[in-house]
């Protein structure tokens, strides 16, 4: 008897071709479209695409509404993190709670043996590994997935190139339209800018003071939630001739502190809410502090459920609230959330 796989289907080329690969490998495939955020127009388009793909491939498509859970687990933390002057990473939270949380629960319900997605990542059932296509690798966003479920996960695209996937889809009658769809690289529930979305829930536009690193008022800004660490535009600095960057944010006083690029240098971080795939308490490894950045050599000490990370070279513009993800070569070792820099 063939093994049953529940495949997350978004209506995009990656999940569509993943379904085709899984069928070719002999799996019994059923699709799942998850309604996450409350954007009817978005779902109308993407659910229709997912259904078109499922019909073409001859697989059953389930549709479930997860908006309430998404709001609690992803959207509210997104708003709260910005309100605290930090920079959130909603995709990592969504992957843990919904795409590999609620989806796995649904897989149990229908008797599926595995869960699959079109993510560009690899796994051997014990660890995650970076995808072969380093321009599309999504391992950074999956660091928070519970390690106990790795044996149940399949990623058909982990050893493929994105260009290969699009070329294959383009060559098949019935799938060519999926190859030509415009890709979305932004947060799926943010239609324009994150501040446009936030202003429906919190006061975003509120003029405040710009301070230099000595505490002197040197200008004004349009509201602290418009800024993230390292930003260099959108505020005034009286008499400045050189570029100034946001080096910290004080949400309680609606202030941003700015300085020169060297003031952004960071040599250590502290991480909380850890998700580690190793039990080691002190080790040397590498860490990525943002998506699509190089891994920095570091030393890690786990003390009282927090990771104290000493960087072996300076990194500029490290944002509190973002994910820090550990790698041993291309092997993902887990990570945590930047609490202090």
Curated annotation (Swiss-Prot):
Keyword match Acetylation: no
EC main group: transferase
GO cellular component: cytoplasm
Binding site for ATP: 8-15, 34, 118
Bridged cysteine pairs (disulfide): 94-188
InterPro entries named in the record: MnmA-like (IPR004506), MnmA-like_C (IPR046885), MnmA-like_central (IPR046884), MnmA-like_central_sf (IPR023382), Rossmann-like_a/b/a_fold (IPR014729)
Broad class of where this protein is predominantly found: cytoplasm
MF (Gene Ontology): ATP binding; tRNA binding; tRNA-uridine 2-sulfurtransferase activity
Entry's localization field: Cytoplasm
Site (Interaction with tRNA): residue numbering on this chain: 119, 322
SUPFAM superfamilies linked to this entry: Adenine nucleotide alpha hydrolases-like (SSF52402)
HAMAP family per record: tRNA_thiouridyl_MnmA
Family: Belongs to the MnmA/TRMU family.
PANTHER family: MITOCHONDRIAL TRNA-SPECIFIC 2-THIOURIDYLASE 1, TRNA 5-METHYLAMINOMETHYL-2-THIOURIDYLATE -METHYLTRANSFERASE
Protein name: tRNA-specific 2-thiouridylase MnmA
Organism: Sulfurimonas denitrificans (strain ATCC 33889 / DSM 1251) (Thiomicrospira denitrificans (strain ATCC 33889 / DSM 1251))
UniProt lineage: Bacteria, Pseudomonadati, Campylobacterota, Epsilonproteobacteria, Campylobacterales
Gene: mnmA
